[in-house]
From Swiss-Prot:
Species annotation: Trimeresurus purpureomaculatus
GO biological process, alphabetically ordered: venom-mediated platelet aggregation
Cellular compartments per GO CC: extracellular region; other organism cell membrane
Disulphide bridges, residue numbers: 2-13, 30-127, 102-119
Full protein name: Snaclec purpureotin subunit alpha
Annotated ranges, domain C-type lectin: 9-128
Length: 133
């Protein structure tokens, strides 16, 4: 079950936070909101559709992008894309060297495609956590 101000999909709970924060501050905010919460990870096509529909219903202006939990982490010589909640990135994503290391969903794409932007930008965001059974 999810708290009353959160939306549910399968066993997870989701909440849109309409505060402008950097990626790191948004991730920290999610962690502070609820035990086990992170910026949203999107692990399947069906979950992507759910997230896009939830955002479309609640975010009416194109001026907002929405942080998701995906970022490029530098590990020595290697760069890898990782979800902040530790879930696996389950598709091939070749990241060319790029200073834009954090990802948003944009209204223009109906919140369906992931775009990389600078992590220091401020955007609204969505938190996700595993609900209680």
């Amino acid at each position: 079950d999810c708290p009353s101000d959160w939306s549910s999909f399968k066993q997870y709970c989701y909440q849109i936070i309409k505060q402008l924060k950097t990626w790191e501050d948004a991730e920290r905010f999610c962690l502070d909101q609820m035990k086990g919460a992170h910026l949203v990870s999107i692990e399947s096509y069906r979950e992507a559709v759910f997230v896009a529909e939830l955002l479309s219903e609640n975010v009416k202006t194109t001026k907002y992008h929405v942080w998701i939990g995906l970022s490029v982490q530098n590990k020595g010589q290697q760069c890898s894309s990782e979800w902040s909640d530790g879930s696996t990135v389950s598709y091939e994503n070749l990241v060319k060297p790029n200073p834009k290391k954090c990802f948003v969903l944009k209204k223009e794409s109906e919140f369906r495609t992931w775009s990389n932007v600078y992590c220091e930008q401020k955007h609204i965001f969505m938190c996700k956590f595993l609900g209680s059974r």
